[in-house]
C-alpha cells in the first residue's frame, strides 16, 4: 500500500512519502522556483546566504530643466478674448445686431464704447459749408448794378462831378462819353461802314443795320467793359441823352441828331 502511493506521487511533480509519523518531502523533487532578482538574472538556490551584489550607481548628472520641458505634457490653454466688438448675431428681422459681451472686464481695464469715427469725420467734411469768396466794394457794385447800361450822360456827368473835387488826378482819369466818341468818328471819317452823316450841317447821322454791332463792340472796348457791348445797350444810352440835350432821336430808322452847340462852327448850317 505504501509502495503504490509512492509510485503515484513520483514524477515531475513533487513526490512525498507518507508515514504514520508525518509527511516527508523529497528534497530533489521539491526544489524552489527561481525568481528574477533586481539585476534581471535568476536567483540561485544555493546562494541564499550570500550577500547580493551592490547595484551599479550611475554618476550624478546635473538637472536640465530644458530637457525635462521637452517631455512635459502639454496643458490645455484657455483662450482669452479682448474687449473689442463682440461677434454679431442676426436678429429675426434680418438686421445685423451686435451680441452682448458676456465677459466681465478685468481689474484695471477700461472698456470704451466703439464709435464710428469714419462716418463722423466724413459726415462733417462732406456737408461743411465752403467760405464764400470775399468781394471787393467795386465788384459788389458791378454785380448789383447793370454793367454800363444806364444813361451814359447821367452816369458820366456824376463821375465827372465827383472827380473834380479830388484834385489833379480827376482830369487824367476823365472818361470819353458816348456822344463825344460818335462825333469824333464822324468828323474823322472812321468806320464809315458802321455810321455816316445824313445831314452834316444839321448834325444828323445814321447807323448801319448790318454793322451796328461792330460799332457797339468798338465802343465797349473803348470804355473797357468786361461784358460784351451790344447795339441795344448803346441805343438805350443814346435815348437817355434826350434828357440832357446832347443827342435826340430823329423819326427815322437808326437815325439821330447832335445838338447844334456840339458841332464845329464850320459845319453849322
Curated annotation (Swiss-Prot):
Keywords: Activator, DNA-binding, Nucleus, Transcription, Transcription regulation. Residues 42-63 are annotated as: TAD2. Coiled coil: none annotated. Residues 176-259 bind DNA. Disulfide bonds: none annotated. One of its GO terms (cellular component) is nucleus. One of its GO terms (molecular function) is DNA-binding transcription activator activity, RNA polymerase II-specific. Residues 1-32 are annotated as: TAD1 (Acidic). GO terms for biological process: cell differentiation; immature B cell differentiation; macrophage differentiation; positive regulation of transcription by RNA polymerase II; regulation of DNA-templated transcription; regulation of transcription by RNA polymerase II. It is found in: Nucleus. InterPro entries: Ets_dom, ETS_fam, WH-like_DNA-bd_sf, WH_DNA-bd_sf. Belongs to the ETS family. Sequence specific transcriptional activator which binds to the PU-box, a purine-rich DNA sequence (5'-GAGGAA-3') that can act as a lymphoid-specific enhancer. Promotes development of plasmacytoid dendritic cells (pDCs), also known as type 2 DC precursors (pre-DC2) or natural interferon (IFN)-producing cells. These cells have the capacity to produce large amounts of interferon and block viral replication. Required for B-cell receptor (BCR) signaling, which is necessary for normal B-cell development and antigenic stimulation. Can form homotypic interactions. Interacts with IRF4/Pip. Interacts with JUN. Interacts with TBP. May also interact with CREBBP and EP300. Interacts with NONO/p54(nrb). The protein contains a weakly acidic N-terminal transactivation domain (TAD) followed by a second TAD rich in proline, serine and threonine. Each of these domains may be required for transcriptional activation of a subset of target genes. This is Transcription factor Spi-B. It comes from Rattus norvegicus (Rat). The lineage of its organism: Eukaryota, Metazoa, Chordata, Craniata, Vertebrata. The gene is Spib.
Amino acid at each position: 500500500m505504501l509502495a503504490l502511493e509512492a509510485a503515484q506521487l513520483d514524477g515531475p511533480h513533487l513526490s512525498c512519502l507518507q508515514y504514520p509519523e508525518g509527511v516527508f518531502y523529497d528534497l530533489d523533487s521539491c526544489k524552489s522556483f527561481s525568481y528574477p532578482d533586481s539585476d534581471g538574472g535568476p536567483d540561485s538556490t544555493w546562494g541564499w546566504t550570500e550577500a547580493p551584489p551592490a547595484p551599479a550607481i550611475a554618476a550624478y548628472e546635473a538637472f536640465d530643466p530644458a530637457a525635462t520641458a521637452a517631455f512635459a505634457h502639454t496643458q490645455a490653454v484657455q483662450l482669452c478674448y479682448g474687449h473689442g466688438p463682440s461677434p454679431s448675431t442676426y436678429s429675426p428681422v434680418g438686421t445685423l445686431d451686435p451680441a452682448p459681451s458676456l465677459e466681465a472686464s478685468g481689474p484695471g481695464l477700461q472698456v470704451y464704447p466703439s464709435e464710428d469715427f469714419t462716418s463722423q469725420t466724413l459726415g462733417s467734411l462732406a456737408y461743411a459749408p465752403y467760405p464764400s469768396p470775399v468781394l471787393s466794394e467795386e465788384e459788389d457794385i458791378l454785380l448789383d448794378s447793370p454793367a454800363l447800361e444806364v444813361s451814359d450822360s447821367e452816369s458820366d456827368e456824376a463821375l465827372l462831378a465827383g472827380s473834380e473835387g479830388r484834385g489833379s488826378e480827376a482830369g487824367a482819369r476823365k472818361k470819353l462819353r458816348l456822344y463825344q466818341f460818335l462825333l469824333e468818328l464822324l468828323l474823322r471819317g472812321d468806320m464809315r461802314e458802321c455810321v455816316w452823316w445824313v445831314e452834316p450841317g444839321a448834325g444828323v447821322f445814321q447807323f448801319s443795320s448790318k454793322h451796328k454791332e461792330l460799332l457797339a463792340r468798338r465802343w465797349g472796348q473803348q470804355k473797357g467793359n468786361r461784358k460784351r457791348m451790344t447795339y441795344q445797350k448803346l441805343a438805350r444810352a443814346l435815348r437817355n441823352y434826350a434828357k440832357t440835350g446832347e443827342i435826340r432821336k430823329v423819326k427815322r430808322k437808326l437815325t439821330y441828331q447832335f445838338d447844334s452847340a456840339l458841332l464845329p462852327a464850320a459845319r453849322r448850317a
